[in-house]
Swiss-Prot record:
Keyword Transit peptide: yes
InterPro entries per record: Ribosomal_mL42
Name assigned to this protein: Large ribosomal subunit protein mL42
GO biological process: mitochondrial translation
Family, per entry: Belongs to the mitochondrion-specific ribosomal protein mL42 family.
Pfam families xrefs: MRP-S32
Quaternary structure annotation from Swiss-Prot or TrEMBL: Component of the mitochondrial ribosome large subunit (39S) which comprises a 16S rRNA and about 50 distinct proteins. Component of the mitochondrial ribosome small subunit (28S) which comprises a 12S rRNA and about 30 distinct proteins.
The keyword Ribonucleoprotein is assigned to this record: yes
Main location: mitochondrion
Presequence positions on this chain: 1-31
Cellular component terms per the entry's GO annotation: mitochondrial inner membrane; mitochondrial large ribosomal subunit; mitochondrial small ribosomal subunit; mitochondrion; plasma membrane
Amino acid sequence: MAAAVKWAISNRTIWKHLLPIQNGALSSACHKSTYSSLPDDYNCQVDLALTADGRTIVCYHPSVDIPYEHTKPIPQPDLLHNNEETHEQILKAKLEVRKSKQLEQGPMIEQLSKVFYTTKHRWYPHGQYHNRRKKLNPPRDR
């Protein structure tokens, strides 16, 4: 309990130093937020203040009108000379990647069989026919 009171007092004194309160009311001079990630030349006004009781932080950030001269039109895509990838091109690229991965699997199995002196059949997965006949819970030996 004492730690919570100490934290509240220290927190209140910190905010009193950051934001001045005069005669129990909000100060007329609000400071710009130091925690803003916006650059200084950004067209935005951010002000912080405390309420009279010191329990609530008030943030004022009105929307600022942007002059028409500072805006840019949205670029329209050229439908005749479109250099962007289409859906079909993306699918073809993915299919080529899959085929190349399948081709890489062949030499890998041959290399494994040479390294461990086994047949190539050991490195291929068993099919569904073999997996169905495998006993999942064989009886325990006595």
